[in-house]
Every structure is written in C-alpha cells, then in structure tokens.
C-alpha cells in the first residue's frame, strides 16, 4: 500500500491521457443524448430503452478504444438476458461497470451516492435510472426496482458496496440478498 506497482512511463501516461479523453468525450455525448431523448423527448419507455442502448453501445466502443486493455467475453452459460434477473458481481476496478453494462442494454445498476452526484457522469447515471443505495434499500427503491424488473431490466449489484484497495473480496452487504428474495 502506498507504492506504485508500475513505473510511470511516457507510454502509460499517453494511454491514460487518451483513455481519460475518450471517457470525457463519451460522457459529454451520453449526457447530451440523455438530455435530448429523456428531457426534451420525454421519458417514454421507448426513449428509456434507446438511451440504455446508446449507453450499452458506447461502453462496447469505449472498451475497444482503450489501448493495452483486451476484452474477451466468455459466455459459458449462453446467457442472453431474455429474462430479467439479479446480477451480483464483485467490484475490482472502474472498468467493471463498463464491461458489465456492455453486455445488454436492459441492465440497471445500484450505485453509491457519490457516483450519483459525480460531475463527470452523474447525469448519465440518473438518465439511465441507476439507483443510489448508500443508505440501504428502502421501500421506495425496492418498488422502483420491481417496476424495472417488470419492464424486463436486470439489476446489477456490487454487494461489497465499494472497491477494495488490494482487490480482495470485502464484506457483502445484505441488500443484494434482500432484493433477490
């Protein structure tokens, strides 16, 4: 803890700058699309699905655009997300979200409050109907999520609530299991 595992090189610095630029441009584009589709166009189910599709496709492009990061999808269970469900995943890096949400447009993520309020992508999170659960699952949130499941959306939960500094698996909060019931 406290020491870099990799030295900073010009190559790493350029890759980081490029990746962050792609991220910022993608955030601006998705925020604009969300505003046009869901604020001006109205929050119809059709527009919500369109926005989720743009989000999913943007993540697919971003994953391919990040230099030095390979993405290989191994769908050994042949999951096609034709039925909604609860997706429980551990959370090791910022890339986890992109890799998970690129799988299907009908995925809604439970998030922390700081992500909900993030200046870079908070609007995208709100347009996509991702829900903050930092304070736990209240009845209002559970009802919103039930409605999303009835509309065919799967719910993505990182039950640890945050990423660990050393990539170890942290304590699982009970909300994921409560929601699954």
Predicted regions span which residues?
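A transmembrane-helix-recognition feature enriched in membrane-embedded lipid enzymes
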Residues: 7-72, 123
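Short, Lys/Arg-enriched N-terminal segments with co-localized hydrophobic residues
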Residues: 1-6
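Soluble catalytic domains of membrane acyltransferases
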Residues: 70-181
């Amino acid at each position: 803890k406290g020491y870099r595992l990799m030295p900073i090189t010009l190559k790493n610095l350029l890759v980081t700058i490029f990746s962050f630029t792609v991220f910022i441009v993608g955030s601006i584009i998705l925020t604009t699309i969300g505003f046009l589709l869901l604020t001006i166009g109205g929050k119809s189910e059709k527009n919500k699905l369109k926005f989720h599709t743009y989000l999913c496709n943007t993540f697919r492009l971003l994953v391919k655009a990040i230099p030095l990061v390979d993405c290989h999808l191994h769908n050994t269970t042949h999951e096609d997300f034709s039925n909604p469900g609860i997706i429980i995943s551990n959370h090791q890096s910022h890339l986890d979200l992109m890799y998970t949400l690129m799988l299907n447009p009908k995925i809604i993520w439970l998030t922390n409050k700081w992500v909900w309020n993030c200046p870079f992508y908070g609007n995208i999170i709100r347009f996509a109907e991702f829900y903050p659960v930092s304070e736990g699952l209240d009845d209002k949130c559970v009802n919103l999520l039930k409605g999303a499941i009835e509309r065919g959306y799967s719910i993505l939960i990182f039950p640890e609530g945050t990423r660990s500094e050393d990539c170890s698996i942290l304590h699982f909060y009970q909300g994921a299991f409560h929601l699954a019931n």
